[in-house]
């Protein structure tokens, strides 16, 4: 069964859960979030629909769990990438990693390309864990030495996340997101000042 700790991290996941989540991710990548259905996930995972519904009562619950698992992978990667960084360097790393994640992730790429409006809907619902992402960014900045008050740090993390999502979901011709040097330069010039020097 799914277990969430108080901080939103996933608890232990069984082999069946992993198989369902891996398959669900593939189905969401293939059909998009709106067109995907539990029947396809069950058939491809080799389990019954009732097995999925016992673990994930709705498609939104299943999608939320897939996204949360992606978030945990992102933040474990971010923790490694920002080890020994200053808060300013961490902003650059987080932005560059976030852009690369969306480019490399078939799931996020599918959403950005065919269902970008879902990011807006998800940010106002429990499905897309925008709070978890913002908290993770705040945690990373604090670990890297950010010394601003907690409330200010939470606001800064939220702003950084929303700016990054805006650029990723609605690309601009002012930034070539396929050019990592340009992405890092953009973050250093425009996002680092938000955290202060």
Model regions and ranges:
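Hydrophobic/aromatic-rich alpha-helical bundle segments in the mid-to-C-terminal region
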Residues: 143-189
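Amphipathic alpha-helical packing segments from all-alpha helical-bundle domains
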Residues: 72-75, 119-147, 151-158
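Short hydrophobic clusters on alpha-helical segments that form packing/core surfaces
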Residues: 20-28, 74, 78, 98
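Amphipathic alpha-helical interaction segments
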Residues: 19, 61, 73, 89-97, ...
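Hydrophobic alpha-helical connector segments
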Residues: 65, 79-106
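Short hydrophobic/aromatic patch on the recognition helix
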Residues: 45-56
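Short linear capping/connector segments at secondary-structure termini
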Residues: 80, 112-120
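Basic, helix-initiating cap at the start of DNA-binding domains
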Residues: 1-44, 61-64
């Amino acid at each position: 069964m799914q277990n969430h700790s108080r901080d939103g991290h996933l608890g232990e996941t069984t082999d069946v859960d992993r198989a369902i989540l891996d398959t669900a991710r593939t189905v969401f990548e293939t059909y998009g979030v709106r067109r995907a259905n539990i029947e396809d996930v069950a058939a491809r995972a080799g389990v019954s629909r009732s097995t999925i519904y016992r673990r994930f009562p709705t498609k939104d619950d299943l999608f939320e769990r897939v996204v949360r698992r992606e978030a945990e992978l992102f933040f474990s990667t971010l923790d490694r990438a920002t080890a020994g960084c200053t808060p300013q360097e961490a902003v650059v790393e987080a932005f560059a990693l976030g852009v690369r994640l969306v480019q490399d992730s078939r799931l996020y790429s599918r959403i950005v390309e065919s269902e970008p409006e879902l990011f807006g809907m998800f940010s106002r619902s429990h499905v897309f864990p925008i709070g978890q992402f913002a908290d993770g960014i705040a945690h990373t900045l604090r670990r890297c030495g950010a010394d601003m008050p907690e409330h200010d740090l939470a606001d800064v993390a939220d702003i950084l996340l929303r700016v990054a999502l805006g650029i990723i979901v609605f690309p601009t011709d002012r930034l070539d997101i396929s050019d990592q040097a340009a992405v890092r330069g953009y973050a250093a010039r425009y996002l680092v000042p938000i955290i202060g020097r």
